[in-house]
C-alpha cells in the first residue's frame, strides 16, 4: 500500500513520459479512485460552502464550477511538471477557508433593471470587484493541486482504465456528499472527510506544514461550528435569531433575512385577503406552497381551513417551524406536511383544492450546477399556473400568491400570467413602498367567486409570462445581463492567460480540439438533463443528486462498453447521437408531465440519458488510443468550462435551443476529429462489421 499511502507516483518527468505498460497494481488503482473521490467531493463542498458565506455566489453557483473545471484542467496539464503541487493542497484549502471566514460577503448589487435577486441587502465585507476574482483564482488553485494529484496517477494507466477509475471515484464522491446532505451535516463533517482523505493519500510522507494546515482546517471549521450555531440544510446555511420585541423570530439563510416566525394573530391583514376576498369559499381543502416555518399554514387554520396540504422544499425550515412556531400549525391534525417541490407536488396529486396559495416562495439560491435556475423558477411559469388552475375546485376554487416583488414590472408580469392562465384579470393589492412593498394577487376560476377590492389593469409594455422552456421570471428581457457578460468575459480572459502560462503554446492541445468541443457540448447536455428532471420531478437536492449520479453511471456504461468493443465506424455513433438529440427536440420535457410518475420517469431517463451515453461512446472511442491522456483530458475539461459559459445563452433562447448548440458542437468535434477517426479505423484494420469485440485487456491497448 506504499503508493496509496503517499509515495510519489511520479518521481521525475521522465517517468511521466513513459507509456503505460502492465497493470500498475491494486494500490495505485485505489489511489486514483481515492484522488478522484477527493476531487469531486471538494468541488461540491466548495460550491455549497462558498455560496453560503459569499451571498453573491448563491446566485452564481457555476462561478465556482467554472473555477473548478479551469483548475482541474490546469492540474492535468501539469502532470509532467518537475514540481509536484499536490502536497500543497492542505495549505491552499486552509488559506481559502481562513480567508472566507475572515471576510464573509453579503452582496446585493445587480443592474437593478435586468434581473432581480430577492433578499437584496447592502454589501458587507470586501468589495465585489476584489472578492470574486480572489475566490475564482483560489478555487482554481485548490482544484489545480488536486487535479495534478489525479493526473500524476492517471498517466500510469491506459486511458480508458484511468477514466474508469476516475468515474468510480467520482460516483463515490457524489454519494458521500449526498449522504451528508441527507444527514444535514455541517461543514465540519466535510472538512474532516477531506482532511482524512488527504492524510491517507499523503501517509508517512506528509510534511509538518501540511499536517499543520490540515489541523488548522479542522480547527477553523470546528470553531466556526461552535460559535455560529448555524444549521445546515441540503440548500442553505440557516441562522435563527433572537426573539424580537415584536415577538417574532428572524430566520436567515446564507446570511440574508428570509423569514420571521410570527403568530398568526399578529400578521398584517393583507396576508388574509385571499380569504376575505372569497367569503363564500368553504375551504374544505387548502394547498399552501412555500409553507416555510408555518406562518401561512397557521393563518389558513385561523381562517377555518378544514384540511391543509403544506408543501415545503427544505426539511430543516420545516423542522424549525415544528419547534419554534408558537401556533404549532404543523402539529394540527388538520395539516398534512409534504417535503417536496411545489410544482412536483402539483404534478403528483389528483386532489382538487378550494384554495391554492403560493406563500412567499423565495428560494434565494440556485439549483446546484446550473447557472440560472432557482428552486422556485418552475412555480411561476404559465404552465405552472395552468397546472394550479386545473387543481382548483370547478367554479369556486381560488388561487392566490403574495410576495415582496420589489419592482412594478415583476408584479405586472405575474399578474399578466394569472390573467392569461385564468382568462381574466386578478385582484391586486399592495401595502408598503419600494422594496418593502408586499403585493397580493388573487384570482378564481369564476370571477364571481372573489370580491376584488381592486382589480389589476394591464399597463402598456407588460412582459409576457415566463414559460417552462424559459423560466426566468426575474429576467426583464431575453438577454444576458451586463454583469454576467462582464464576469464571463473576465473568466475566459483569465483562463486563456493561466492555461498559456502553465502549458506553454496552445498548439500542444490543438491535436485534441475535437475533445475540447466534446467537453463543451457535454456540459450543455448535462445542464439540459438537470433542467429536464427539475421540471418533471422537482428542484429538490435529491432529484439533483440522482441526475448527476445517473450521468456518471451513463458515462461508466460507455467506458465499460468501449473497453470491450471497438467501433470501427465512429461516424455511426455521431449519427446515433444526432438522432437522439432530434428525439429530445421533438419530445419536449413538459409533454411528459401529463403521464403518471412511472412512465414519466422511464421516458425521461430514455430521452435524457440516451444522448449522454452515446456522447460518451463518441468520447471514449476517441480517448482510448490517445498518446497523451492527461493533455487530452485537460482539453476536454477546459471545453467543459467553456460549455459552462455558453450555458448562459439559455437566458436568450431558452433551454430547448441548447440542443441545437449541442448538435453544432458535436458537429465541430466530428469535423475537427475526422483525421483521427480515419487513423483509428486504419489501425484496427477496418473490415465490414461495424463492431469488433475484444477482451477488456486487448481493448485498451
At which residue positions do the language-model features occur?
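Alpha-helical transmembrane segments of multi-pass membrane proteins
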Residues: 1-701
Amino acid at each position: 500500500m506504499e503508493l496509496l499511502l503517499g509515495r510519489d507516483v511520479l518521481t521525475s518527468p521522465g517517468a511521466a513520459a513513459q507509456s503505460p505498460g502492465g497493470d500498475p497494481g491494486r494500490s495505485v488503482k485505489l489511489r486514483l479512485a481515492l484522488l478522484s473521490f477527493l476531487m469531486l467531493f471538494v468541488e461540491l463542498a466548495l460550491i455549497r460552502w462558498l455560496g453560503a458565506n459569499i451571498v453573491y455566489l448563491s446566485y452564481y453557483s457555476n462561478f465556482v464550477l467554472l473555477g473548478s473545471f479551469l483548475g482541474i484542467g490546469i492540474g492535468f496539464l501539469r502532470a509532467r511538471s518537475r514540481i509536484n503541487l499536490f502536497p500543497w493542497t492542505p495549505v491552499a484549502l486552509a488559506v481559502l477557508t481562513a480567508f472566507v471566514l475572515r471576510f464573509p460577503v453579503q452582496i446585493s448589487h445587480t443592474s437593478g433593471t435586468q434581473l432581480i435577486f430577492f433578499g437584496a441587502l447592502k454589501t458587507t465585507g470586501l468589495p465585489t470587484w476584489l472578492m470574486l476574482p480572489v475566490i475564482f483564482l483560489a478555487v482554481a488553485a485548490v482544484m489545480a493541486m488536486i487535479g495534478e494529484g489525479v493526473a500524476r496517477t492517471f498517466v500510469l494507466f491506459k486511458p480508458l482504465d484511468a477514466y474508469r477509475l476516475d468515474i468510480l471515484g467520482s460516483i463515490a464522491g457524489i454519494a458521500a456528499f449526498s449522504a451528508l446532505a441527507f444527514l444535514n451535516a455541517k461543514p465540519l463533517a466535510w472538512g474532516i472527510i477531506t482532511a482524512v482523505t488527504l492524510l491517507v493519500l499523503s501517509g508517512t510522507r506528509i510534511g509538518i506544514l501540511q499536517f499543520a494546515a490540515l489541523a488548522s482546517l479542522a480547527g477553523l471549521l470546528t470553531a466556526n461550528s461552535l460559535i455560529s450555531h448555524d444549521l445546515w440544510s441540503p440548500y442553505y446555511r440557516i441562522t435563527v435569531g433572537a426573539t424580537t420585541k415584536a415577538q417574532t423570530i428572524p430566520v436567515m439563510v446564507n446570511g440574508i433575512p428570509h423569514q420571521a416566525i410570527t403568530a398568526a394573530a399578529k400578521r398584517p391583514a393583507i396576508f388574509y385577503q385571499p380569504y376575505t376576498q372569497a367569503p363564500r369559499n368553504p375551504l374544505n381543502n387548502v394547498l399552501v406552497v412555500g409553507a416555510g416555518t408555518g406562518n401561512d399554514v397557521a393563518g389558513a387554520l385561523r381562517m377555518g381551513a378544514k384540511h391543509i396540504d403544506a408543501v415545503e422544499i427544505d426539511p430543516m425550515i420545516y423542522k424549525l417551524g415544528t419547534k419554534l412556531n408558537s401556533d404549532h400549525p404543523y402539529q394540527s391534525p388538520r395539516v398534512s406536511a409534504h417535503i417536496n417541490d411545489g410544482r412536483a407536488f402539483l404534478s403528483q396529486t389528483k386532489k382538487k383544492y378550494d384554495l391554492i396559495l403560493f406563500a412567499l416562495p423565495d428560494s434565494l439560491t440556485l439549483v446546484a450546477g446550473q447557472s440560472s435556475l432557482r428552486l422556485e423558477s418552475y412555480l411561476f411559469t404559465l404552465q405552472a399556473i395552468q397546472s394550479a388552475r386545473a387543481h382548483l375546485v370547478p367554479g369556486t376554487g381560488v388561487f392566490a400568491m403574495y410576495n415582496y416583488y420589489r419592482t412594478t414590472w415583476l408584479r405586472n408580469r405575474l399578474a399578466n400570467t394569472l390573467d392569461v392562465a385564468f382568462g381574466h384579470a386578478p385582484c391586486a393589492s399592495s401595502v408598503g413602498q419600494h422594496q418593502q412593498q408586499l403585493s397580493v394577487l388573487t384570482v378564481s376560476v369564476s370571477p364571481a367567486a372573489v370580491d376584488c377590492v381592486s382589480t389589476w389593469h394591464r399597463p402598456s409594455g407588460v412582459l409576457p409570462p415566463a414559460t417552462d422552456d424559459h423560466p426566468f421570471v426575474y429576467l426583464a428581457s431575453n438577454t444576458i445581463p451586463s454583469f454576467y457578460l462582464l464576469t464571463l468575459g473576465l473568466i475566459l480572459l483569465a483562463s486563456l492567460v493561466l492555461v498559456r502560462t502553465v502549458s506553454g503554446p496552445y498548439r500542444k492541445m490543438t491535436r485534441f480540439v475535437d475533445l475540447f468541443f466534446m467537453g463543451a457540448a457535454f456540459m450543455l447536455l448535462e445542464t439540459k438533463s438537470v433542467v429536464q428532471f427539475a421540471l418533471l420531478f422537482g428542484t429538490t437536492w435529491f432529484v439533483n443528486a440522482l441526475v448527476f449520479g445517473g450521468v456518471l453511471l451513463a458515462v461508466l456504461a460507455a467506458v465499460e462498453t468501449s473497453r470491450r468493443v471497438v467501433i470501427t465506424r465512429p461516424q455511426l455513433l455521431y449519427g446515433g447521437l444526432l438522432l437522439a438529440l432530434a428525439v429530445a427536440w421533438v419530445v419536449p420535457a413538459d409533454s411528459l408531465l401529463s403521464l403518471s410518475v412511472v412512465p414519466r420517469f422511464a421516458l425521461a431517463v430514455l430521452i435524457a440519458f440516451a444522448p449522454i451515453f452515446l456522447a460518451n461512446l463518441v468520447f471514449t472511442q476517441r480517448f482510448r488510443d490517445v498518446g497523451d491522456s492527461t493533455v487530452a483530458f485537460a482539453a476536454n475539461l477546459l471545453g467543459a468550462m467553456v460549455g459552462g459559459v455558453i450555458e448562459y445563452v439559455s437566458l436568450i433562447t431558452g433551454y430547448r435551443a441548447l440542443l441545437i448548440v449541442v448538435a453544432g458542437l458535436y458537429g465541430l468535434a466530428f469535423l475537427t476529429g475526422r483525421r483521427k477517426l480515419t487513423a483509428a479505423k486504419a489501425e484496427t484494420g477496418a473490415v465490414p462489421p461495424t463492431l469488433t469485440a475484444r477482451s477488456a485487456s486487448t481493448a485498451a491497448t
